[in-house]
Amino acid sequence: MTNGGYEQAKAQRNALEKLGEKIPGYRGFQDRELRREVDKLQREHIANELGRLKAAVRDKTRGYTDAGQIGALNGFDRLDRSLDGLSQAIRFADYGASGIFDAVKIGEAELQRLYDFDLSILDDLAGLEGDIAAVPAPGPSPNDAPATALDKAQQRLRALDDKWRQRERVMTDVVQS
């Protein structure tokens, strides 16, 4: 979700919320809560995308299992566990616990920086999806093993995991800007 996600959510407020804007201090509280909600939705979207990729990995794993090529299954299992770990870390992160949602006034430029960071994560997910799609179907010979493609996907997933862990620092930097 980009800055447009926040603006779209803001535009969908009901009459009671709009009335609350008239109460001193309420608007800042309301905006912080809205940012928390948008952040939560963004994280859920990323976690769901990782779950979708995990399902694709399991489909490919099933193909190798059905073909009796069990030697390749370790690589699939590692990728599956890594996808699950990152998905859970993102889904259950303490949203709103960082300074981005405190009473500090955050400018549009700082928010845009955070949204750009989140967009780059979505771009990385698209790359990971391509890596998983590139894992070959089981072939008749052991030379068709998926190890190289699985390693490439695992490397991209590790980089994505590292990037996600940097998000807290980006959020802190946004507040200090």
Which functions belong to the PLM regions below?
Residues 1-65:
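Leu/Val/Ala/Ile-rich N-terminal alpha-helices, chiefly Sec-type signal peptides and the beginnings
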Residues 2, 51, 55-58, 78-81, ...:
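A broad, low-amplitude sensor of folded, mature protein cores
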Residues 35, 65, 95-98, 169-172, ...:
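Structured alpha-helical bundle/scaffold domains in large eukaryotic membrane-trafficking regulators
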Residues 138-177:
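Preference for long, well-ordered alpha-helical segments
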